[in-house]
Curated annotation (Swiss-Prot):
The keyword tRNA processing applies. Residues 248-254, 272-276 are annotated as: RNA binding. Homodimer. Within each dimer, one monomer is responsible for RNA recognition and catalysis, while the other monomer binds to the replacement base PreQ1. This is Queuine tRNA-ribosyltransferase. The gene is tgt. Its cofactor is Zn(2+). Catalyzes the base-exchange of a guanine (G) residue with the queuine precursor 7-aminomethyl-7-deazaguanine (PreQ1) at position 34 (anticodon wobble position) in tRNAs with GU(N) anticodons (tRNA-Asp, -Asn, -His and -Tyr). Catalysis occurs through a double-displacement mechanism. The nucleophile active site attacks the C1' of nucleotide 34 to detach the guanine base from the RNA, forming a covalent enzyme-RNA intermediate. The proton acceptor active site deprotonates the incoming PreQ1, allowing a nucleophilic attack on the C1' of the ribose to form the product. It comes from Psychrobacter cryohalolentis (strain ATCC BAA-1226 / DSM 17306 / VKM B-2378 / K5).
Amino acid sequence: MQFVLHKTASGVTRARRGTVHLNHGDVQTPAFMPVGTYGTVKGMLPRDIEAIGADIILGNTFHLWLRPGTDIIDKFGGLHKFMHWDKPILTDSGGFQVFSLGAMRKITEEGVTFKSPIDGAKVFLSPEKSMQIQYSLNSDIVMQFDECTPYPATHDEAKKSLELSLRWGQRCVDEHKNLGSTNALFGIIQGSMYADLRKQSLEGLLEIGFDGYAIGGLSVGEPKEEMIDVLDYIADDMPADKPRYLMGVGKPEDLVEGVRRGVDMFDCVMPTRNARNGHYFVTGDADNAGVVRIRNSQYRTDEGPLDPECDCYTCQNFSRAYLSHLNKCKEMLGAQLATIHNLRYYQRLMQNIRDAIEQDKFDEFVNEFYSKRGQTVPELNLR
């Protein structure tokens, strides 16, 4: 993997424009990665994902390991061939899914024992096993196995958790090397909401050495203000010559705020999940903060496109009234068209951000973005 930093935005912002060169292609940053948990982005054919402009998607190590299993995916030569996607794939390590199991899991120094959510069988996942699974999947970007610190957590709990993740991180690097993998391996910064612990985690990861660095342990129930605080005091300390990835975040404004603080990569289920629930992201609509809730009665006879500024297949061919009809009837096509639009909205957002950085107009872009949504630009408190 190679990361090339092309430009940093002018002014006080830390926004960056770059390219991540990976085994299956290049990723233009800042980038948003659609989530394909089970080897598919819900409601999307691979050609649809490419058409909306995605350079990279995210797969889920935990779920693909349990079903269909790496033995089956191995027969196809990896996840790319299994799902017919020839561009880059990032896979998470399984740490967040294990975290979400709650009482169903037991964490030790060696790894995590839990009951499979599929059949209740006892399963063990370790840093080494996570690396082996991701090696079988042939992910372009492999994530270290970590413990996602819950929120809230005491200082002692968060410290103990991050130190376990650091030890696991070293084991991940060792196993990654033993496997002879040529794919990139990213470390994950933990430490809950504590500035000193976040810095301790980052320093520990830098000593181990990774190809890129991710900010984990956010979007786990904390107030947005605390999430932004973490970004304010950690993002700029991350190496300038490595990709910076904010995991599991989020709303369009969260992406903009992450970019303002120097983040390069994002993923979240929000655009696809919200699409299935009839919530569509649009460029304007200041009265509704950039969201059309298609179930509202006002759209029942609306002849206009979902988003007049959008070039996606949905907006170019269908009215809000038709989308309202499909949603009310619970037709599969409605969810598919909604997903196409929401993911295209996110990709257009990132493209517009990249263009604005290149043209030294990022501050103007930010002002216009919030103005169209009827929102004020949040303060930037970089430390």
